């Protein structure tokens, strides 16, 4: 069964958005999509009163779990991914749209997987499980999308990853020194 994509947004997304969504979902095993009914593209997400969220934040995506007889579905806000103000903000958002959409969609799909299909994940472990799932499948999606730039930088990836880990470690140590 294929996941349906509905566009309820007044914001015009890039023309191949549906193909992008299908390519992102193709990077995830088909069993992990079991039960996911649809993906809805909207302008902004208006959470209902059951969801506690700080004011002033704009959700890029929201997962709606199974409720009664309705199957689970995902909602993605194009207003958060494609801002309407400022030429350079709009340009940067259009250039990064594919990657941002992949991150949001894989995060929502990870929530679906961890809440409905995966067993043994406790509430306290949910955020870490979703993050690791998203990173794993984002990496595989990015590798499948790789053009000439990806092929050129592939030999340098291990070195760049080690450098990023050392910078992250140094950042965490500095953060501990400042708070401690």
Q: Where would I find each of the regions flagged by the language model?
A:
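Active-site recognition of the HExxH zinc-binding catalytic motif
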Residues: 99-116
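A metal-dependent hydrolase signature that marks the N-terminal structural subdomain at the beginning
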Residues: 1-75, 88, 171, 175-179
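Mid-chain, well-packed structural core segment of small domains
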Residues: 80-95
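Long, well-structured alpha-helical subdomains associated
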Residues: 6, 14-15, 140-180
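An active-site-proximal "capping" alpha-helix that borders the catalytic cofactor pocket
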Residues: 124-140
């Amino acid at each position: 069964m294929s996941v349906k994509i509905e566009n309820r947004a007044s914001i015009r997304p890039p023309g191949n958005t549906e193909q992008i969504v299908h390519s992102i979902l193709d990077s995830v095993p088909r069993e992990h999509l079991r039960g996911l009914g649809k993906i809805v593209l909207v302008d902004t997400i208006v959470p209902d009163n059951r969801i506690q969220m700080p004011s002033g934040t704009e959700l890029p995506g929201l997962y709606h779990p199974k409720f009664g007889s309705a199957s689970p579905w995902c909602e993605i806000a194009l207003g958060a991914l494609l801002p309407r103000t400022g030429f350079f903000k709009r340009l940067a958002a259009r250039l990064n749209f594919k990657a941002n959409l992949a991150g949001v969609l894989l995060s929502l799909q990870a929530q679906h997987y961890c809440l409905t299909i995966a067993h043994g994940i406790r509430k306290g472990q949910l955020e870490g499980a979703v993050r690791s799932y998203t990173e794993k499948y984002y990496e595989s999606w990015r590798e499948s999308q790789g053009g000439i730039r990806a092929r050129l930088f592939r030999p340098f990836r291990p070195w760049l990853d080690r450098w990023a880990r050392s910078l992250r470690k140094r950042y965490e140590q500095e953060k501990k020194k400042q708070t401690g």
